[in-house]
Amino acid sequence: MKNIIVIKLGGIAIENLNDAFIQQINAWHLENKKIIIVHGGGQVISNLLTKNNHSTIKIDGMRVTAKNDLPIIYDALINIVGHQLLERLKESNLEFFQFKEKIKELVSAEFLNKNIYGYVGKVKEINTMLLEKMLSRDIIPIITSLGVNEQGEYLNVNADHLATAIAKKLKVEKLVYMTDVPGVIEKDKTLATLTINEAKTKIENKIITGGMIPKIESAIQTLESGVESILIANNLQKGTIIRGD
């Protein structure tokens, strides 16, 4: 379905959603674009864990998750971040569906490495039929970064990886990573475009560093699966567009 746009929102991006974001969502809707929104929890999860006297440990950027952390993480993702996002998006007058318990029907996951990360999952399967049914009715799904394993247990899933998995599975037109930076930065300037080979070279030459590396690597894999373009930005219009060579 080439008219689908997947938008991944980080915690800071959700806090800073502005009228321009709502206007762009409405504009895409008028162009008959189908939209899917994926979000994580970030600092909200950390704050709620701390409030409940649970520690936050990260290994390789992944939040180590104990089984008794999951009710708190669920609460942060669904009842705080997801609810806040839904209330903001309602200003567009479009129809949205927030995945809560129904996430069990959408995202199948398995342990990433239980011995190291605990109840952290990697995406195993996406129920694309469920998404396509919603999109055909002009409903915009709001999907949080959780998955469910074969035992029916919730697993904490990386939101970037979940958005990538959905984009690859549906072979969407565009994937947007909304972050707290305007795009890929080189010499204090935002790069307008990047090809796959240029991106790989900039990683090798340490021009692209830190938290941007996994985003770029995910972008490359997504493009190679058939997605047309990826936008990394702090808005929906202008940032760094990555395309195939």
Swiss-Prot record:
Keyword Nucleotide-binding found: yes
Keywords attached to this entry: Amino-acid biosynthesis, Arginine biosynthesis, ATP-binding, Cytoplasm, Kinase, Nucleotide-binding, Transferase
Any one GO MF annotation of this record: acetylglutamate kinase activity
GO biological process terms on file: arginine biosynthetic process via ornithine; L-arginine biosynthetic process
Sites annotated Transition state stabilizer: 8, 215
Tagged with keyword Nucleotide-binding: yes
One GO CC annotation: cytoplasm
Compartment(s): Cytoplasm
Alphabetical list of InterPro entries matching this protein: AceGlu_kinase-like_sf, AcgluKinase_fam, ArgB, Asp/Glu/Uridylate_kinase
Residues engaged in binding substrate: 41-42, 63, 156
Enzyme class: transferase
Record-listed E.C. numbers: 2.7.2.8
Biological function: Catalyzes the ATP-dependent phosphorylation of N-acetyl-L-glutamate.
HAMAP family given in the database record: ArgB
Family assignment from sequence similarity: Belongs to the acetylglutamate kinase family. ArgB subfamily.
Protein name as annotated: Acetylglutamate kinase
Organism: Staphylococcus epidermidis (strain ATCC 35984 / DSM 28319 / BCRC 17069 / CCUG 31568 / BM 3577 / RP62A)
Gene that encodes the chain: argB
